[in-house]
Amino acid sequence: MSLIEKLFGKRQKTASIARERLQIILAHERNGRAEPDYLPQLQQELIAVISKYVKIAPEDIKVQLERQDDLEVLEVNIVLPEPQQRTVA
């Protein structure tokens, strides 16, 4: 073992360094993702189910996911029409 290797240690291969960095970036992005993949589909399914009973427009439903420390809160806001317009034909 040469003196340089003793002082600085063995160098990692570029591919393994790149892989480690990519894993860190992916883990960070997964944790920082504001909206899970299923929210748009959940919103569409809610629209379909609620439309069976009440006449609503797609923009009348808002689905949000909020994170607070270790807690996740799914918030669903639905704007309902006036009572005389609620029935579905």
UniProtKB/Swiss-Prot annotation:
Organism this protein belongs to: Laribacter hongkongensis (strain HLHK9)
Gene3D superfamilies documented for this protein: Cell division topological specificity factor MinE (3.30.1070.10)
Any one of the GO BP annotations: regulation of division septum assembly
Similarity field: Belongs to the MinE family.
One Pfam family cited in the UniProt record for this chain: MinE
Biological role: Prevents the cell division inhibition by proteins MinC and MinD at internal division sites while permitting inhibition at polar sites. This ensures cell division at the proper site by restricting the formation of a division septum at the midpoint of the long axis of the cell.
Gene: minE
Protein name according to UniProt: Cell division topological specificity factor
Entry keyword set: Cell cycle, Cell division
